[in-house]
Amino acid sequence: EIGGIGVAVSDKPEGPYKDALGKPLINEIVNGAQPIDQFVFRDDDGQFYMFYGGWGHCNMCKLSPDLLSIVPWEDGKKFHEVTPSPSYVEGPFMLKRNGKYYFMWSEGGWTGPNYCVAYAIADTPFGPFKRIGKILERDPEVAVGAGHHSVIKVPGKDEYYIIYHRRPLTETDGNSR
């Protein structure tokens, strides 16, 4: 399946949501990246960037201030590949902490026991990224398939929590999370 990325809007977080464009924002494979698993990152200067991609490739694009369109880069391209590691599979996420950009992603087989989250650090959101290692792996006593995450920061503190999905050991369907 090709996949696709759309934009939905609502006046309230709980919805209801409606399709903002009437068509996908991205509906094609570019640089080998399947259009899935988008993550929007707002940098300190107010610029919004979207990271997305499956099938072992990750793209980055600039978004308009209203988040409804893609703004071409200075070279005229809409997408730049920023795949951080040969082990990248899907689920990109970025945060900025102490002036450094932390890029995280899922790797391994998403239906198997080796699905996990790895991370890299860079001085800019564009890279180059230096892989540091894995930040989340399965606990064979608890569950498998730990991956595809987000991170939240406790307001006013240098404290973060990772939120992810996994499968209990009793679950045998690799597509169940």
Can you describe what each PLM-predicted range is?
Residues 1-177:
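Carbohydrate-active catalytic/glycan-binding domains of CAZyme proteins
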